[in-house]
């Protein structure tokens, strides 16, 4: 009857409300915990800077000294408060167990061919870092690099992996303790034996090989002392020839005030014909230069001399270059130009901008 149905509906709503209140109670941390937190007192210094005649106080300048005992003590005190709160959250274990269950499945990347081997990344489910495997001629897979074994505490990670033209040599960068300052290790890709001393003090860098002779990488002059907070605003592009000491690496770009950029990257085209150099002063917008690697001592030729767009090389076919750009095209387009006259006035649309984002 209608009355019976109505009573059943009301009973269902009542049970639902009780369950929601129960779940809310279980999922909400105790409010008393947050009200009882005693935050460490942060000392205020007396540093004052003057910019354009105006005095600007900077009372926490002392925290920029990341190597000082006082800063270390401040960090320990902050961590004690933070983890003191996090550790008492009643449903923290439930969250961890749920995430563990969701993440616990095998993950395998797309394969890629280098030399005589086919490489791929694999994670058995709960490994902190993906492992690099390889196979040869359909044989059994073997581990090539396992970043989980790079350090005892597991804080050293694999950042970049790149192979020489014939796949016989590999260069990979590692980050220790989460630092942006990295080392590049060079190994025989067949035997996995280290070939030379690692390159050190490398930061915000890719690895782009020129044939089998060496590779381009980027870094800053490493500051002394406060590595974690010192200003790094002049990136430099170098070429490392295999067998040479790092101090002999050739500076390609970024060494002068006119070439000053916060970020500089170098990319060698697949046919080893051109080096493409991209420079940025922020995280958006880049200028662009090109160098013919087949001509000894060839000059750097400007493609773009401003930062009004994000423009990147897709590929080249002989001397014809293909760029993806948003220059005067917010939805992006693909343009083509000959490397002999690569400036923007010579660009031709290959795929024009449309109402859809490319």
Predicted regions: what is each one?
Residues 5-8, 17-358:
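Beta-propeller folds
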């Amino acid at each position: 009857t209608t009355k019976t149905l109505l009573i059943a509906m009301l009973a269902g709503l009542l049970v639902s409300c009780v369950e929601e209140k129960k779940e809310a109670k279980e999922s909400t941390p105790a409010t008393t915990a947050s009200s009882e937190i005693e935050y460490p007192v942060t000392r205020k210094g007396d540093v004052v800077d003057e910019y354009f005649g105006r005095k600007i106080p900077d009372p926490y300048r002392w925290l920029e000294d990341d190597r000082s005992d006082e800063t270390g003590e401040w960090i320990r005190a902050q961590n004690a408060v933070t983890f003191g709160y996090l550790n008492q959250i009643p449903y923290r274990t439930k969250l961890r167990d749920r995430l563990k269950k969701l993440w616990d499945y095998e993950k395998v990347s797309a394969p890629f061919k280098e030399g005589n081997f086919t490489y791929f990344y694999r994670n058995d489910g709960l490994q902190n870092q993906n492992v690099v495997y390889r196979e040869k001629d359909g044989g059994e897979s073997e581990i090539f690099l396992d970043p989980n074994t790079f350090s005892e505490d597991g804080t050293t990670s694999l950042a970049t992996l790149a192979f020489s033209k014939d796949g016989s040599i590999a260069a990979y960068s590692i980050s220790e303790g989460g630092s942006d300052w990295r080392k590049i290790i060079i190994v025989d890709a067949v035997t996995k034996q280290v070939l030379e001393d690692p390159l050190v003090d490398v930061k915000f860098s890719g690895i782009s090989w020129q044939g089998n002779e060496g590779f381009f990488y980027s870094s800053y002059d490493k500051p002394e002392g406060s590595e974690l907070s010192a200003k790094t605003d002049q990136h430099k592009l170098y070429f490392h020839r295999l067998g040479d000491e790092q101090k002999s690496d050739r500076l390609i770009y970024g060494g002068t005030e006119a070439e000053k950029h916060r970020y500089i990257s170098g990319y060698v085209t697949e046919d080893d014909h051109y080096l493409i150099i991209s420079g940025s002063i922020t995280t958006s917008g880049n200028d662009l230069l090109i160098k013919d690697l087949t001509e000894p001592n060839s000059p750097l030729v400007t493609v773009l001399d401003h930062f009004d767009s994000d423009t990147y090389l897709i590929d080249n076919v002989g001397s014809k270059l293909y760029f993806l750009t948003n220059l005067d095209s917010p939805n992006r387009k693909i343009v083509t130009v000959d490397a002999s006259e690569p400036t923007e006035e010579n660009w031709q649309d290959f795929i024009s901008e449309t109402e859809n984002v490319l």
